[in-house]
């Protein structure tokens, strides 16, 4: 997994270097991703369509999705990758498999292996798997909501029994770092032009920079605390999508959170409302900003980021920016079926 640029750091080493910084601060990081994807097939005309018409948590024994998940999980477990949960997601043909918490570097490796396993098992089932963030108009996008915990030795550094929502000052500062640097890191966590159709397509995808307690419209969610589960205290970053490079995405997320801890960022007030239902004026009054609306705007935000440049290293940083600029310029040059349908008949 190396960049094709002379002297660029291997992608894995970028994460290793960030984890060394986390360790220098006295922490160990554990990660738990919820990985969404679609199972698709081609119809008689060659058009891509979902393999089923099921919905959220549908369970049809003997169906393609059920058998697929059973076989995929069995293969993952045989390879030493532990699965926490699996279920059918909200879109037709959409599935989710959640991997059990592991240290950040092992989890990045596991995610890469996971994708290969899912694609292989899908082919064995006579279909294909796609981790494309938004493959269908009007259907939910595929995210990779990722939970983070920092430990100091055997103690969860995000837990404080006296804190609001059992969240420690360390956890609050970590969230504050994620929020302050969210725009800068979005090009890495959402690296394709298609990623922004998910972020701004509704269906519980986060578009606005805020946090909340069990608020699924927020960019950062603090899950409900369960009594007796102090070691499970965690922070969920909901922006990242299923196409992200896990080594780079985890590295920049940790860099943002660690910056918040080191500089003791103050956490803004939580958002209790569904952010999508608020007006622009209401969001403005609450100080809630927007994530980038396109890859181009995300690249502009990243290009001025000392934090991302320091995390990736100069060569990888510049390579990434050049690569993404080529991508959005190639995309912008396309004339789409939508444009032809809208304008060709009447202009």
Describe each region flagged by the PLM.
Residues 3-4, 8-347:
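Glycine-rich, acidic/polar active-site loops that bind/position phosphate-bearing ligands
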């Amino acid at each position: 997994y190396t960049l094709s640029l002379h002297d660029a750091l291997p992608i894995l080493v970028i994460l290793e270097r960030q984890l060394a910084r986390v360790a220098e601060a006295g922490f160990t990081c554990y990660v738990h991703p919820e990985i969404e994807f679609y199972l698709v097939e081609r119809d008689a005309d060659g058009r891509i369509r979902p393999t089923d018409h099921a919905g959220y948590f549908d369970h049809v024994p003997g169906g393609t999705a059920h058998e697929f998940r059973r076989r995929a999980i069995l293969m993952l477990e045989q390879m030493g990758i532990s699965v926490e949960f699996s279920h059918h997601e909200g879109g037709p043909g959409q599935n989710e498999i959640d991997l059990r918490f592991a240290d950040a570097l092992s989890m990045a490796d596991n995610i890469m292996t996971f994708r290969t396993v899912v694609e292989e098992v899908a082919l064995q089932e006579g279909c294909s798997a796609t981790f494309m963030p938004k493959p269908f108009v009007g259907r939910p996008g595929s995210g990779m909501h990722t939970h983070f915990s920092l430990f100091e030795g055997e103690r969860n550094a995000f837990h404080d029994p006296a804190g609001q929502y059992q969240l420690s000052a360390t956890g609050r500062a970590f969230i504050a770092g994620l929020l302050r640097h969210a725009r800068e890191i979005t090009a890495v966590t959402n690296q394709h032009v298609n990623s922004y159709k998910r972020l701004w397509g509704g269906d519980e995808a986060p578009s606005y920079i805020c946090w909340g307690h069990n608020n699924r419209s927020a960019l950062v969610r603090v899950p409900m605390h369960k009594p007796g589960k102090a070691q499970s205290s965690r922070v969920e970053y909901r922006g990242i999508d299923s196409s992200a490079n896990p080594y780079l995405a985890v590295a920049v997320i940790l860099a943002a959170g660690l910056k918040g801890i080191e500089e003791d960022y103050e956490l803004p007030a939580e958002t209790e409302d569904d952010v999508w239902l608020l007006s622009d004026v209401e969001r403005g009054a609450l100080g809630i900003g927007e994530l980038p609306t396109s890859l181009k705007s995300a690249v502009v935000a990243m290009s001025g980021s000392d934090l991302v440049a320091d995390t990736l290293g100069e060569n990888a940083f510049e390579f990434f920016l050049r690569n993404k600029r080529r991508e959005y310029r190639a995309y912008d040059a396309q004339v789409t079926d939508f444009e032809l349908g809208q304008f060709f008949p009447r202009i």
